[in-house]
Amino acid sequence: MNTTPAQNQTPAQNQNPTPAQTPAAPRGGRAPQRSASSPEGGGVGALTGLGRALRSETLKILTVRSTIVYLILAAGAMFGPMVLGSLLSGGDIESFTLSDLLIGTGIAQVIVVAFGAAGAAGETRSGMVAQAFLTEKSRSLWLIARIIVSAVAAAVMYLIGVALGWAVVQLVGPGLSADGVRPLVGGVIGIMAFAGIGAGIGALLRNTVAAVAVPVCWLFVLESMILMASSAYEMFRPVAEILPGVRVGELSGSGTGMVTEYSPVVDALIVIAWLVVICGLGLWRNRRADTK
């Protein structure tokens, strides 16, 4: 009986390859959960994601040409009046005060609210925000970062304008006499708040023209009309007391005198409440609405 000789096989050839072993899942079929202390989960992960979003929004603002335009406008609104005042004073003014130096704050507020609104609305309308939706863990991260970066950028623009105005007064004008830092502190808080409010309105309306027009009309037209109506009709008085533009003016010490004077802390809390409400509406719209 013929038999076929057995093939020579090495031990390695006789053994079948086994797949790589993976850790068994716990009983119940649930995968192991990440620890909240790991870099990718919990509060640390959220802070890391917000940090990346802040860096991204900062790069966007620094690399678009419109930022330079808004910087020139906001800074010009601050030092422009000082240039004219210094050149036209003719030696009749002994010195300017800090309140005189900040006379252009109202115009700067309108410019930065347009800056914040146009930036947030433009991101959504152009579809750029879709990249943030795909790369970030939460839809809200990009908008929170945009609000923070817009507020900080607006404060920088404002302070640059103040510094240029101070330089003009010191070099060309009669000099500057200090009358307290309240106008400057109130101006910075108002500038940052209005830039953040503008970003919230931009995310809420998602239309660049409407997002810029609504807050500008509110500050220039509606608030003045409500103030005038409150002096004649008592029913408008409660509304006039909490207007954001009015409270920012009271906070910086340049109020109209047509509303109740609260402490600076109360004025700041009212302005912050407006910021939280409007940005909250913007965050809600950002989470619920899709982008094209």
Label each residue range with its predicted role.
Residues 2-37, 47, 51, 250-292:
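Alpha-helical transmembrane segments of multi-pass membrane transporters/translocases
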Residues 50-62:
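A short amphipathic helical element positioned immediately N-terminal to and/or at the very start
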Residues 30-34, 40-47, 65-117, 143-206, ...:
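Secretory targeting signals
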Residues 225-244:
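Extracellular/periplasmic helix-loop junction at the C-terminal end of a transmembrane helix
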Residues 118-152:
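Helix-loop-helix units of permease transmembrane domains in multi-pass membrane transporters
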Residues 57, 136-138, 207:
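Generic structural signal for small/hydrophobic residues in well-ordered secondary structure
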Residues 115, 119, 123, 129, ...:
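Transmembrane alpha-helical segments in integral membrane proteins
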Residues 60, 121, 132-134, 198, ...:
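Helix-capping/transition residues at the boundaries of transmembrane alpha-helices
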